């Protein structure tokens, strides 16, 4: 009887612990100056902790064991503490890293596989690390020493799956974003251009990207993004009048703390517009506040600023203030669904090893008996959806597709409005929409308000894209263009400038408008311009290439024929004949005088035909005075004279 009563009391005790111990799960943790704030997904405060500290700054979240690690700058004995949230109003802070000097912690990161803490020291300009299992017996070790190069390590973040540590170097002369393997090898500066003063940094395991804050010159700041190897650098947003320090990421958004406005701000990870301004938003949603401070949700209208390449037209900004705080906001962490990454090929092995270590730790601290068997059954029933309960940490590890403190929420339940839901490889719900629907949750009907001005919306059977059948006098993809208004504008211009080109189809519209306003409207000369709508296939872009092709073919054919003629034409015979000049001069002319008759040649003069100027005797020094004297023909006839006096025929 006593044994049964003991078992019953034990079961009741455990049940109360399960039901009260973790009543509401937090999604974000924020360090203020003197406390840590826990808020849910709607940014409602669910708990506060660490009230005994006075100078909190950086923090990190071990999602595998539900522990917060944070820094206090004024504690005399320790610099880094751990906080285990055990209830709605209960927490336990423990000393983790002892203080060994005048440290100034800039950022903290935690590796759940090796249970190792990494932190940057702004004063010593080094990055340290220590295992929480051996920190009581071993001194922290140096992973990276930037003191010799005058570097300043600020933010640190761990790629848990890729086993690398990332940090920002805020050296004013040579700022960088760097990484190193967790074993201390392979240091590499992955970003060293177009960067001013980088601050906080975070690794997005799902998107396999890094995000960091860059404190730009003047009053501006930027949030940047890049692949894990430093490629594909993107500007997520650029704004002013903020003093951001640290940031966190979730599946869709980025969050950062701002000391100037004492707020937490958010922005989409994939912005619709790259450059934003903090302008007044049309949203009427009340911004959550802490301890009575009112929230406006946006800057004043006077803060709209047209500078450089930024937007000059006020519009609804994707930059959103999430919560107003009474103290200076410093560090921030977010729940990212660590165990949901077990579907990722790179992360699955790491997560399996972490779960294996937790299972071994749980088995080593248990003694099986009747009470334990009853507790096992109760704990198995506590975690729903196939989740596993860890009594030492007092939380459930959910399988992919489930979330909540008891894994009670199926992420696919009612997620897709008009479609089928499946859990993606990254552990997130994904919708496959029915024809005619789109959106992340298939909540958008493609034809809803798609066609304007009475247009009829139709869906393509193959692509599923929406198109519009527009009524008369309307056109455009969504029937957004009023043909009457457009033609009226052109015909008004035509009234003042006769060279104005009026679009096709405006003749009848302008003619109708001219009946009421003939002094303002001119009617186009041509009623139909079919050639503008359907150009002749034998003109323009078709005829010109065809003509060029024909000309090239004829040119090639001519070259080919000329080559054949040169190849097969018989060679011309080599002519070498001699023209002989007589030795005696004429004696039968009574007009011969020493002045008119040349002296007799002492010997025979001859010329070779092939040396003549193209069979032309006019330019040769040898001549026949008798034949040339009475010849009045031109040089073309010299060939006949030359041939006439040959010793024999040419051929």
UniProtKB/Swiss-Prot annotation:
Residues 22-540 are extracellular. Keywords: Cell membrane, Differentiation, Disulfide bond, EGF-like domain, Glycoprotein, Membrane, Oogenesis, Repeat, Signal, Spermatogenesis, Transmembrane, Transmembrane helix. Glycans are attached at residues 77, 102, 114, 183, 324, 482, 499. Residues 374-408, 409-440, 443-480 form the EGF-like domain. Coiled coil: none annotated. Pfam families: Ldl_recept_b. GO terms for biological process: canonical Wnt signaling pathway; oogenesis; positive regulation of circadian sleep/wake cycle, sleep; spermatogenesis; triglyceride homeostasis. Residues 1-21 form the signal peptide. Belongs to the cueball family. This is Protein cueball. It comes from Drosophila willistoni (Fruit fly). The lineage of its organism: Eukaryota, Metazoa, Ecdysozoa, Arthropoda, Hexapoda.
């Amino acid at each position: 009887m006593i044994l049964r009563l003991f078992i019953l009391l034990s079961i009741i005790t455990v049940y109360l612990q399960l039901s009260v111990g973790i009543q509401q799960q937090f999604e974000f943790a924020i360090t203020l100056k003197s406390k840590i704030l826990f808020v849910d997904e709607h940014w409602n405060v669910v708990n506060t902790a660490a009230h005994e500290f006075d100078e909190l700054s950086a923090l990190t979240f071990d999602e595998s064991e539900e522990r917060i690690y944070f820094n206090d700058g004024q504690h005399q004995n320790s610099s880094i503490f751990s906080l285990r949230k055990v209830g709605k109003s209960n927490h336990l802070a423990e000393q983790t890293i002892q203080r060994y000097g005048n440290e100034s912690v800039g950022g903290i990161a935690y590796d759940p596989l090796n249970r190792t803490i990494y932190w940057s020291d702004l004063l010593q300009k080094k990055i340290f690390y220590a295992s929480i299992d051996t920190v009581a017996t071993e001194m922290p070790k140096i992973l990276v020493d930037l003191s010799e190069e005058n570097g300043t390590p600020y933010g640190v973040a761990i790629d848990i799956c890729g086993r690398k540590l990332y940090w920002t170097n805020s050296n004013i002369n040579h700022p960088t974003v760097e990484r190193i393997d967790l074993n201390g090898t392979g240091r590499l500066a992955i970003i060293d251009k177009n960067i001013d003063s980088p601050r906080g940094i975070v690794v997005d395991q799902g998107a396999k990207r890094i995000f960091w804050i860059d404190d730009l010159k003047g009053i501006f700041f930027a949030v940047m993004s890049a692949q894990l190897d430093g490629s594909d650098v993107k500007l997520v947003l650029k704004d002013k009048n903020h003093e951001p320090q640290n940031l966190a990421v979730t599946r869709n958004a980025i969050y950062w703390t701002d000391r100037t406005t004492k707020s937490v701000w958010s922005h989409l990870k994939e912005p619709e517009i790259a450059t934003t301004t903090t302008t007044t938003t049309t949203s009427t949603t009340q911004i959550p506040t802490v301890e009575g401070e009112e929230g406006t949700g946006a800057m004043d209208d006077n803060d709209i600023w047209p500078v450089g390449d930024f937007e000059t037209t006020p519009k609804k900004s994707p930059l959103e203030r999430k919560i107003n705080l009474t103290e200076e906001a410093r560090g921030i962490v977010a729940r990212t669904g660590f165990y949901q990454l077990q579907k990722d090929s790179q992360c699955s092995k790491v997560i399996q090893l972490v779960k294996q270590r937790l299972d071994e730790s749980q088995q080593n601290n248990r003694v099986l008996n009747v009470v334990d068997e009853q507790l096992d059954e109760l704990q198995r029933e506590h975690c729903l959806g196939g989740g596993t309960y860890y009594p030492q940490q007092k939380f459930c590890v959910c399988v992919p597709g489930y979330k909540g403190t008891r894994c009670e929420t199926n992420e696919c339940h009612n997620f897709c409005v008009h479609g089928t839901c499946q859990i993606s490889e990254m552990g997130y719900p994904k919708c496959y929409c029915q024809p005619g629907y789109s959106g992340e949750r298939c909540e958008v009907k493609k034809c809803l308000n798609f066609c304007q001005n009475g247009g009829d919306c139709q869906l393509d059977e193959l692509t599923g894209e929406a198109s519009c059948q527009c009524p008369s006098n309307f056109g455009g993809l969504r029937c957004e263009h009023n043909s009457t208004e457009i033609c009226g504008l052109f015909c008004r211009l035509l009234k003042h400038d006769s060279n104005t080109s009026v679009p096709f189809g405006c003749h009848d519209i302008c003619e109708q408008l001219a009946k009421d306003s003939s002094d303002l409207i001119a009617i186009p000369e041509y009623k139909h311009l079919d050639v503008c709508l359907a150009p002749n296939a034998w003109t323009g872009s078709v005829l010109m290439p065809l003509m060029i092709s024909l000309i090239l073919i004829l040119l090639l054919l001519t070259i080919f024929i000329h080559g054949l003629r040169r190849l097969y034409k018989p060679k011309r015979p080599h002519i070498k004949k001699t023209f002989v000049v007589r030795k005696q001069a004429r004696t039968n002319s009574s007009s011969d005088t020493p002045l008119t008759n040349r002296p007799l040649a002492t010997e025979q003069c001859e010329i070779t035909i092939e040396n003549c100027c193209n069979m032309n005797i006019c330019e040769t020094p040898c001549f026949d005075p008798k034949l040339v004297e009475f010849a009045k023909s031109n040089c073309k006839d010299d060939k006949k004279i030359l041939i006439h006096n040959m010793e024999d025929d040419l051929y």
